[in-house]
Amino acid sequence: MNKKQEEILNITQEECAELIQIISKIRRFGINEYHIKDKVPNRERLAEEIGDVICMIQLI
């Protein structure tokens, strides 16, 4: 595996972890809830994280 492939896999792993984190928050607090700091609903965060994972998978 070359350096670029390794970096892509590392970033993919990080993006998957972020997706897992928002899924956990949705299960705890609900899909329409949001963080007080920025008021972004969990539904939007989920869509963003899914998009990030899809982008990384396409790079693999």
Label the predicted regions.
Residues M1-I60:
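Flexible "arm" and connector segments at domain edges
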